Amino acid sequence: MGKSIISVDDSSTMRRMVSFTLKSAGYEVLEAGDGAEALALLKTRAVDLVISDINMPKLNGIELTRELRSQPNYSRTPIILLTTESDPAKKAEGRAAGATGWIVKPFNQEQLLAVVCKVLPA
């Protein structure tokens, strides 16, 4: 079995694109529509990487990152944040929360896989 990744995004279109790209590359992919749903899933299933949108209802990507970093099981798990914002202050906030990487939307499949391969070596 390949490495497992959770894709967290309130846009079902974005989740499907991320999931398709990663599954095509041999990863096992779980999906969640927001940070709260992701936390519930991650209590029952461990993953090797978290890819999360920043702007979501209930629990946004930065809040999700902070919550995961406070849990022993996810204190070192790579977390990539996705956003339409290229604001340096937002990037700094994400990194301070514990994000490992950052992808600005829109992005293509090659860009996604390059970042995933960088933070999650084979």
Predicted features and spans:
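Conserved acidic segment of CheY-like receiver
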Residues: 2-13, 18-22, 50
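Short, glycine/charged-rich "phosphate-handling" switch motifs in NTP-dependent
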Residues: 100
